[in-house]
Amino acid sequence: MKIKVSSEELTKRELSASHLKKAIDAIHEEGYIILGNIVPHNHLDLLNEKMTQDSHTIVSSNSDRWEGRRTIGHLQQGAPPFAPYIFPDIVANPIVEHVSITLLGEGAFNGFYNGNTNTPGSTQQNLHMDTGHLWSNLNPSHPTASVVVNIPMIDVTEERGAIELWPGTHLAGDVSRRLDEAIEEAQRKVRPPVRGTTKKGDVLIRDMRLWHRGAPNLSDMHRHMIALVHYVGWLCRGRPIRYVKGCEEAFKNSRVDPHATFLDEPYDYLFDYRGPNS
């Protein structure tokens, strides 16, 4: 489902009551929601240019981030954690946070700021979920405890490798994280997957347990996508997210705790990777 966010909602920095209910219901039932055109395009353009340069650095390094621990052509690649590339409408978007706080409650925190790049010629990932269930063997499973906030830089079409999503699978609490072909084919007969196509400025929010996979990028463009992960406040916290001093202002109005530390000196953000809430 996609919600067309109005100019009035953008001005008020929150969704209307009806749109908020649709967003929350969609995440509970389908496992995801797309919020339309809530990130300014000029910020995405600046990030896209920098992240494309960084992609070439990763590829030329012959790092396993290029060959991929999962699939060739899908890079683990974070956005630069320093000014002028940190924007409040990305790291603390008020519309996104309105959804996250309503869904997860006050005290929700961010445990991840990184991303991935789907490069031209990539192959299909294995079907997977980003986290398991807190309590196993519940069907339907427990309510959402964490969401991934995906922010692409460009229009993401099927040709450009739009993510494959399996609606409703976040509730299958009696299925382990190891999703083999038999599990996949059984679910396909019940409800087939959809493609999470988005327009520039859209944001995709999905339950971390939702089955999904990266698809082949058949275009000649890199598809960069930033990822944050918002957690319910009572979960244990990992290490703070590292940013470089000079961008603190971007977080001043954040309703979701940024769980951030601001370093005096830059660090090797392309190769010093930390997983979600680690």
Give names to the regions the model predicted.
Residues 1-30, 35-138:
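Non-heme Fe(II)-dependent double-stranded beta-helix
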Residues 2-12, 61, 203, 210-278:
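Non-heme Fe(II)/2-oxoglutarate
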Residues 8, 156-215:
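Double-stranded beta-helix
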Residues 106-113, 123-125, 145-151, 161, ...:
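Generic beta-strand structural signal
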Residues 116-122, 132, 153-158, 169-172:
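Short acidic/polar capping segments at secondary-structure boundaries
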Residues 118-119, 166-173, 229-235:
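Short edge-strand/loop segments of extracellular domains
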Residues 129-137, 151, 181, 185-189:
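Active-site glycine-rich loop that binds ribose-phosphate moieties when present
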Residues 137-158, 197-200, 228-232:
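Short, conserved beta-strand element in jelly-roll/cupin
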